[in-house]
């Protein structure tokens, strides 16, 4: 039975122009406020560390919160996207407080612009990043709906590999978005995002 339950949420977008350190600090401040409300206990200042499962580097890889109250578990994931109507990039974070600790927990979030050129047709990312079955699923839709559908499928792929803690390790087309693993819950975030954006949250438990 999946343990992918418990409160979760999204941060507001923080402009990347704020600088990487300030943007991350602002996102962690929002996560701190959300966790305090979710747990009903004060949460102090939070920090962030990384661990790459492939090379062991602490300069990149899966993000993990530091400074959590004793006995509490929470996960975070981050994404960057160019906001609609502007050339400015922004960072968006997701947090999850699992209902019970367990091995193998993972969280992944991805947000993309529905009108991004990469998803416009099958000559771009749409032709190489998706499986035959995924491309067939998109072709079932009216032509005007296909770019957004490709973008949404891509966010599912990104969220899945982030929740697995690996990132893409091979051909993105091999990451199946039509058959979701039993230990993963996928949440379509589109209705929670500004117009023109699509997104997916992946919560992985055991």
Question: What residues fall within each predicted segment?
Answer:
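Core catalytic alpha/beta fold that binds nucleotide/phospho-ligands
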Residues: 1-206
């Amino acid at each position: 039975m999946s343990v992918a339950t418990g409160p979760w949420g999204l941060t507001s977008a923080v402009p990347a122009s704020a600088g990487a350190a300030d943007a991350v600090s602002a996102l962690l401040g929002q996560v701190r406020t959300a966790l305090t409300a979710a747990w009903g206990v004060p949460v102090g200042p939070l920090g962030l560390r990384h661990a790459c499962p492939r090379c062991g580097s602490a300069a990149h890889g899966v993000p993990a919160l530091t400074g959590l109250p004793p006995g509490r578990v929470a996960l975070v994931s981050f994404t960057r996207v160019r906001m609609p109507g502007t050339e400015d990039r922004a960072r968006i974070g997701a947090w999850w407080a699992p209902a019970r600790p367990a091995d193998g927990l993972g969280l992944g979030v991805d947000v993309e612009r529905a009108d991004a050129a990469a998803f416009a047709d099958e000559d771009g990312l749409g032709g190489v990043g998706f499986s035959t079955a995924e491309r067939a699923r998109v072709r079932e839709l009216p032509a005007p709906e296909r770019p957004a559908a490709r973008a949404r499928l891509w966010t599912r792929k990104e969220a899945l590999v982030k929740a697995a803690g690996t990132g893409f390790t091979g051909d993105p087309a091999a990451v199946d978005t039509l058959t979701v693993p039993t230990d993963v819950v996928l949440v379509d975030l589109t209705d929670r995002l500004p117009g023109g954006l699509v997104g997916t949250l992946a919560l992985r438990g055991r």
